[in-house]
Regions:
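Glycine-rich, basic loop-to-helix element that forms the pyrophosphate-binding segment
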Residues: 33-49
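A recurrent flexible, glycine/aromatic-enriched loop bordering the glycosyltransferase active site
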Residues: 83, 88-95, 106-125
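Acidic donor-binding loop at a coil-to-helix junction in glycosyltransferase catalytic cores
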Residues: 142-148
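Conserved donor NDP-sugar-binding/catalytic core segment of glycosyltransferases
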Residues: 66-96
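Hydrophobic helical membrane-anchoring modules
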Residues: 153-205
Length: 205
């Protein structure tokens, strides 16, 4: 990992993120860059990339298995994929949280039959294809990962087993019904770019 460039996009956080990240410089080739909303921060990170693939990770996730990154890259290389994602797991949530994430995983597998979607929590992208698609739409504040990944051809999309652990923070803030309704509306509006440009109050709760 010492030769792998790691970029952390920090949107002026006040929780010591920058200091914590830079504390790993003796083990990792890590830098902190200016961030913003998820689309902006991810695009800024990708602009520094020089490798064949770029991996986008949310800061609050944890890999469920240490080999998931390696296997995602191997899958992308073996099948010449443009985008690879993985399953979402909720280790500390209740059964409803886990049920919702299991439903998300089910629809993610199902999406390969129509328009693929990858979670931004873990999204490995072929850098050349990412730039051809012009990256994440920076005027989109919600489901920017869905909007980008659905442009990937079905045969160029893959899901690697292993998963990432996330929290139930979003469910606690918004409630299961609202999160579920937003998910369904997004899936039903995959064809409507104006839907993604609306303010869904996702980051205001």
């Amino acid at each position: 990992m010492s030769s792998t460039k790691v970029l952390v996009a920090d949107a002026n956080s006040t929780d010591g993120t920058r200091e914590i990240v830079l504390g790993f410089r003796d083990r990792l080739n890590v830098s902190v860059i200016p961030g913003g909303m998820p689309s902006v921060g991810r695009n800024l990170g990708a602009a520094h990339a020089e490798s064949t693939y770029v991996l986008f990770l949310d800061a609050d996730i944890e890999l469920a298995h240490p080999s998931v990154v390696r296997r995602a890259v191997e899958l992308a290389q073996r099948k010449q994929l443009h985008c690879v994602t993985t399953n979402i797991l909720c280790r500390d949530g209740n059964w409803i949280d886990k049920l919702f994430y299991a439903g998300n995983d089910f629809f993610q597998y199902l999406s390969r039959l129509h328009h693929p979607f990858a979670t931004g929590m873990f999204m490995l992208f072929n850098l050349k294809r990412f730039r051809q698609l012009r990256g994440f739409h920076e005027q989109v504040a919600f489901a920017e990962d869905y909007l980008l990944s659905q442009q990937v051809e079905r045969k160029r999309f893959g899901i690697v087993r292993g998963g990432v652990f996330t929290t139930n923070r979003r469910f606690q803030k918004m409630g299961h019904l609202r999160v579920g309704w937003l998910f369904l509306k997004t899936a039903m509006n995959y064809w409507n770019p104006n839907y993604f440009l609306r303010d869904h109050k996702y980051w205001q709760t």
